[in-house]
A protein has these predicted regions:
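Acidic/His-rich, metal-assisted hydrolase cores and their charged scaffolds
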Residues: 1-209
Length: 209
């Protein structure tokens, strides 16, 4: 990523702030503009109140793409004026220099496909980086369609955040929690058999600490 010969598209979770910060730094080191979507920008904006070191920073290299569905949601919840706070960072398809490789994108597959088509038409072949659990790629054919469009292959660069049972047991034994709430799992019902003080909750339930 040190050269600017090709734009780089990264497939990753928009809510993974650590990954976004890593991309922000990589873009700065390589002299690129980092393009994220509206959801990621608002998330960074809200978290910056708690952690001022997070991007964005004044006069930096961060740009914001407004996907229609996200734009409509923001306007519906907060009004059209909310979008003005990011006006100086706004970028859309008409503002992208498709003859340049100076970009690092973290956007949805739909936006990725549209932008990749623009680069290909300009004779610029994008690079693709996949940074999520591989199961998503196997289940969603949008990833293979992007490969077909660009003639590029997704480069797998990812450290999984998933933990195995023996690792979770070591953590629970070390922490000895008064209450253990299973989250982000397909096997919440099994926790009672392996852990003490488990407390199952459903989506929308309130937990009073």
């Amino acid at each position: 990523m040190t050269s600017q010969e090709a734009p780089v598209f990264v497939a990753g979770s928009g809510s993974n702030i650590d990954r976004t910060v890593s991309l922000y730094r990589a873009a700065r080191r390589s002299g690129r503009e980092l393009v994220i979507d509206l959801y990621q920008m608002i998330l960074l904006d809200k978290l910056k109140a708690l952690s001022p070191g997070l991007p964005p920073h004044a006069n930096d290299h961060l740009k914001v793409y407004y996907p229609k569905n996200q734009r409509d949601t923001v306007v519906r919840q907060w009004g059209e004026g909310y979008l003005l706070r990011y006006a100086s960072r706004h970028i859309n398809r008409s503002k992208v220099d498709f003859g340049s490789g100076k970009y690092l994108f973290r956007v949805s597959n739909g936006v990725t496909k549209s932008l990749c088509r623009g680069f290909m038409e300009a004779g610029v072949k994008p690079e693709l980086v996949y940074s999520m659990w591989n199961g998503y790629r196997e289940k969603q054919d949008s990833f293979s369609r992007i490969e077909e469009l660009t003639g590029a292959k997704w480069q797998y660069i990812h450290t999984s955040g998933h933990a195995y049972l023996h690792t979770l047991k070591r953590l629970a034994d070390g922490v000895a929690p008064k209450r253990l709430v299973p989250v982000h799992t397909l096997n919440a019902d099994d926790f009672d058999r392996h852990f003490e003080n488990t407390h199952q909750m459903s989506n929308g339930d309130e937990l009073v600490l």
